[in-house]
Amino acid sequence: MAGEIENGRRNGAVSGDPSLSGFSKLDAQERLERFIGSGVLTPGDLGILNGGLPSEIAENMIENRVGVFGVPLGFAVGVPIDDRVYFALPMATEETSVVATVSNMSKRVRENGSLTTEVLGRGTIGQIQFDFVEDPQGFEAIVLGMKDALIADINTNVIPKMVERGGGMTDIAVRHIPIPDGTHMTVVHVVIETCDAMGANIVNQICEYLKGPLEAATNSQANLRILSNLATERLISAHIELGGVDPIRGTLIERASLFAENDPWRAATHNKGIMNGVAAVALATGQDTRALEAGAHTYAAGSALSTWRMQGANLIGDMRLPIAVGTVGGITHIHPQVRLAQRILDNPSADQLARIIAGTGLLQNLGALTALTSQGGITEGHMRLHLPNLAIGCGANQHERGPLVNYLEEILAETGRVSATDAQNGLSLLRAQA
C-alpha cells in the first residue's frame, strides 16, 4: 500500500533499508524521484505538489480572498505507529527541524522500541446553554426523563444515514455551572459519534434541533447551541517504549518531564513541542488545526500533556490527547494536496488518522526532550458559508454551483440543517431539469 511498509519488515530490514536513509542529503528533485521509485508518489502527483491550491477552490473556501498563502509540505520517513511503518508521513509546517525530528525519532523507535496508540472514545460533544434556570434539579429531571426519546428522534429523523454508518447520538447529560456573581447556568451536553467526520456542522445542527423541544419541556430559554472543541469523548492515548537509553540521559528526560508536569510556564513550551507534530500532520490532512490546539491546551490546563519515566533500562512516554479529526467533509475532499496526503496514508479512517497524529506528537515530544537534555446562532451562518464547498464536493460544475447553492439555501432556511446528501439530491434534480 502507498505510504506503508509491511509489518513483516518492521523488525528486520526496515531500519537498514536504503530507501529510508539519506533523505536530508537529497535535493528536492532527488527526494521526489525516491518517493516515485518507492511507489509513494506517481509522476502525476508532481503537479499537485507544485501546483498549490487552485484559485477556483480557494475562492469558495473563505471570504474576501486575495491569494493563497503557501506552507512547506514535507514527508517524515519510516514512522512506526502501531503495527505499521509509514514510509512517508505528510507534514505541513513553516518551522525548521519538525519533520527531521519526527524522522530521527522514528528511526530510534524502529530500531529499539515501539509506539502504540489507542482510541479511548469516538463521541463529539455539543452544548446547549440555559441561563437563569429557576429549578436546576427539576430541569435536569425533565431532560433526563426525555433522554431516550430525544436520542431516538435524532437518530431516526435527523441523522439516519450516520446511524447506518455506525454512528449516531449516544448520550445526553446535564451540568450545573456556578458563576462568580452568585448566579448559575445549566448546560445540556449531547454526545454524537460522527464516524469519519470531524462532526462540527452536524453537532451544531443537532443542538439547534434540540433547542425547541428542550425549551418547551422545561419552560426555559436556550442561549448558545454549539459543539465543544474540548473533545474529552474522543481521547487518543499514545505510548512509546524505548530501549537502549543511556541511564543518565533517561533520568534527565524524566526530570524535564516532571518540570513540565509541575510548572505551567514550562508546560506551555513542552506542549507546544507536541503540537508541532500534531498540527503539521493535521494541516497536511485538512483538519481544523485551531480546534485541535484549543482542545489540547484546555485539556492540559497548565500541566504537561505527556509524561516520561525511566522503568528499568527503558524510557517510557505516555500521552492522552483529545483529537477530533475527520477524513470526510470539510476540505478533505476538495483540496488537491489534502487528497494526496490522505492517499499517501492509505486513506485512513478518522480513528486511524487520530492515532497517526497522536503518535507523531509524542515522537516530536521525545525529540524535543532529547534535544533539550543534550548539551547545549452559528449553525445557519456557518453552514451558509459552507454551501459552496458542498456544491463542489458533490461534483457540481462551475455553471451548476450557483443554482445548487440557492437550492441548498432554501433547504437550510426551511429545516435549519443541510447535508452532502441534500447537495447530491439537488444536483441530480438540476441535471434532470436541464
Predicted segments, located by residue:
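C-terminal catalytic subdomain
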Residues: 285-291, 297-396, 401
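Conserved phosphate/anionic-ligand binding catalytic regions in large, soluble enzymes, centered on
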Residues: 71-101, 195-203, 261-287, 361-371, ...
